Amino acid sequence: MKENYNYPLDLSWSTTEMTEVLSFFNQVEKFYESKVEKEVFLESYNAFKKIVPSKMQEKQLGRDFELSSGYSLYHAVKEVKASGKRFVSADKA
């Protein structure tokens, strides 16, 4: 993980929308750095998807976030959805 990085945000979003998107990015960071509660993570992802409904835009934001932070939105969402556990974290193999 990089120490300081920028979040990919769309300046046309409202303050509330930016807050929701940042909250989801924070959940992804938490997934990689410690652990997340599955329900909270998925609620945050669903709020993110209401703001970013386009798969193409989601992939672009995910690529930009990964280039900036080193964290993959795609893999975080995939692992959390597939997990049967209440708390989930990235496998640190």
From Swiss-Prot:
Gene3D superfamilies: BH2638-like (1.10.220.80). Transmembrane segments: none annotated. It comes from the Bacteria. Belongs to the UPF0223 family. NCBIfam families: PRK04387.1. This is UPF0223 protein YfdD. The lineage of its organism: Bacteria, Bacillati, Bacillota, Bacilli, Lactobacillales.
